[in-house]
A protein has these predicted regions:
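N-terminal signal-anchor transmembrane alpha helix
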Residues: 17-47
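Individual transmembrane alpha-helix segments
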Residues: 66-102
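Terminal transmembrane helical module of multi-pass membrane proteins
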Residues: 157-236
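Short, Lys/Arg-rich, polar N-terminal cytosolic tail immediately upstream
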Residues: 1-18
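Membrane-proximal helix-loop-helix units in multi-pass membrane proteins
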Residues: 118-161
Length: 236
């Protein structure tokens, strides 16, 4: 009698499950804040919210308030602040779960990722209203913004350089490095505009998004790549 070979019912290896979870979280983190921004901006109709002119954090201000010559009164301020907070936590966990990082390389990535996560939490807890400048909480908001900008874009550059270790293609790795550099340059430009005094220029919102959105979109794509190829992250 010939023996029958039954299909394997063994569960996926823990490493595969962890890799898929890491990828899913790297999708969910950026998607959360992008979706919160889109919905909050759509709800702001009087006057219409401008992605080019208005600060991102305006969407998290209940208002009415004014800062840097911009009027702020966001109907869904709570949604945007939740998006900031959840982005930082979810994306950090996704990065921490990447199995391809070992030893010192892991900590080199975790440190700026921690700054990114702390930045998201601070942005969510301390909205950047005009009143925040007077009561001192605006300092926490500013620290959160720049910690998030700098930390996230350093993470992008590092993960791009370590692409082989975390299972990303050469193209995706290069994209991460490029968007990280764009983000850091945009952060410097944004800072220079803010400290120059007076009202901000009409494209300040676009400059700020240069520090955030290339990272968010590319990290989301990297997460999707990891979900499709979870085994590539498992070393040894």
């Amino acid at each position: 009698m010939s023996s029958l070979t039954l299909p394997s019912t063994a569960p996926a290896r823990p490493g595969l499950r962890q890799s898929r979870l890491a990828g899913a979280l790297l999708i969910a983190g950026p998607a959360t804040i992008l979706l919160a921004e889109f919905i909050s901006a759509a709800a702001w109709t009087d006057p219409p919210y401008s992605y080019t002119r208005n600060f991102i954090s305006n969407l998290g201000v209940q208002g009415p308030s004014t800062l840097f010559g911009q009027y702020m009164e966001s109907p869904l301020y709570w949604l945007m602040n939740s998006g900031f907070f959840l982005f930082g936590i979810i994306t950090f966990i996704g990065i921490a779960l990447l199995r391809g990082l070992r030893g010192w390389r892991r900590w080199v990535v975790i440190l700026p990722a921690s700054a990114m996560a702390a930045g998201g939490v601070l942005l969510g807890l301390f909205p950047g209203s005009g009143e925040s400048v007077d009561d001192g909480t605006g300092d926490f908001h500013s620290m959160g913004a720049f910690a998030g900008f700098i930390g996230a874009n350093i993470v992008a550059v590092l993960l791009g350089r370590m692409r082989d270790r975390i299972g990303l293609s050469t193209g995706m790795g290069r994209a991460l490095v490029i968007v990280g550099i764009i983000g850091l340059v945009s952060t410097v430009t944004y800072f220079v505009v803010l400290v120059s005094g007076g009202e901000t220029i009409g494209v300040i919102g676009l400059i700020e998004r240069g520090a955030t959105h290339p990272f968010l979109i590319t990290m989301l794509c990297a997460g999707a790549s990891i979900v499709r190829r979870p085994g590539a992250l498992i070393g040894g």
